[in-house]
C-alpha cells in the first residue's frame, strides 16, 4: 500500500498478552506500519488473551475519535481444541461488533491450528495486513457514505 496522507484516520489497537513473545513483535510492526501509512494510533490496549478483546473493542468503537480497531493476537494449537474455540468465537464477536458499530475491526490474530514456529513466520504479514485493511476500509466507508446514490450510478469505490 502506498504511503498517503491519512492523518485524519485514527486507529485503536487491541493486543493480546498471551503469547506475548509473538504479539509484542506484532504490535511493533503494526505501529511502524501505521506510522509509515501516516495514520494515527490513538490508543493501544493490552488484554490478557484474544478471547478477552471484544469488550475493549466495543468500548473503543463507541468513541467518535476512533475510526477503526486493529486486533493483534496469536492463538497457538495445543493438545485440545481450545485454540479453535478461542479463535472462532473471537473472530465471530469481532465481526459482529464491526457490523453493529459500522466501523472496521480487522483481524490480526494468527491461528487457530498453528504452531509457535508458524506464528512467528506470520508476525509481519498479519500485523501489516491488519493495519492496511483498517485504513482501506475506513477510506472506502467514508467515500461510500459521501456518495448520493440517488444522483450517481455505476460508482466504483477502491
From Swiss-Prot:
GO molecular function terms noted in the UniProt entry: 6,7-dimethyl-8-ribityllumazine synthase activity
This protein is called: 6,7-dimethyl-8-ribityllumazine synthase
Catalytic positions are 82
Gene Ontology biological process terms, A to Z: riboflavin biosynthetic process
Q: Which reaction does it catalyse?
A: (2S)-2-hydroxy-3-oxobutyl phosphate + 5-amino-6-(D-ribitylamino)uracil = 6,7-dimethyl-8-(1-D-ribityl)lumazine + phosphate + 2 H2O + H(+)
User: What enzyme category does the UniProt record give?
Assistant: transferase
Please tell me whether the keyword Transferase is annotated for this protein. yes
Provide a GO CC annotation, any one.
riboflavin synthase complex
Biochemical pathway: Cofactor biosynthesis; riboflavin biosynthesis; riboflavin from 2-hydroxy-3-oxobutyl phosphate and 5-amino-6-(D-ribitylamino)uracil: step 1/2
Instruction: Kindly list the positions annotated as binding 5-amino-6-(D-ribitylamino)uracil.
Output: 18, 50-52, 74-76, 107
Keyword Repeat appears in the UniProt entry: no
Taken from the record, one Pfam family name reads DMRL_synthase
Query: Could you tell me the EC number(s) of this protein?
Result: 2.5.1.78
Q: Which residues bind (2S)-2-hydroxy-3-oxobutyl phosphate?
A: 79-80, 122
- Function text: Catalyzes the formation of 6,7-dimethyl-8-ribityllumazine by condensation of 5-amino-6-(D-ribitylamino)uracil with 3,4-dihydroxy-2-butanone 4-phosphate. This is the penultimate step in the biosynthesis of riboflavin.
Amino acid at each position: 500500500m502506498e504511503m498517503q496522507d491519512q492523518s485524519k484516520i485514527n486507529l485503536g489497537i487491541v493486543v493480546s498478552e498471551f503469547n506475548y513473545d509473538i504479539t509484542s513483535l506484532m504490535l511493533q510492526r503494526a505501529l511502524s506500519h501505521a506510522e509509515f501509512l501516516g495514520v494515527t494510533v490513538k490508543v493501544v490496549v493490552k488484554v490478557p488473551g484474544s478471547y478477552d478483546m471484544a469488550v475493549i473493542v466495543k468500548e473503543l468503537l463507541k468513541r467518535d475519535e476512533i475510526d477503526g480497531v486493529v486486533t493483534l493476537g496469536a492463538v497457538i494449537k495445543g493438545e485440545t481444541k481450545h485454540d479453535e474455540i478461542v479463535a472462532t468465537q473471537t473472530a465471530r464477536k469481532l465481526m459482529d461488533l464491526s457490523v453493529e458499530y459500522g466501523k472496521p475491526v480487522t483481524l490480526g490474530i494468527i491461528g487457530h491450528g498453528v504452531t509457535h514456529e508458524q506464528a512467528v513466520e506470520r508476525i509481519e504479514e498479519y500485523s501489516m495486513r491488519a493495519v492496511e485493511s483498517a485504513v482501506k476500509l475506513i477510506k472506502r466507508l467514508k467515500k461510500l457514505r459521501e456518495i448520493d446514490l440517488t444522483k450517481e450510478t455505476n460508482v466504483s469505490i477502491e
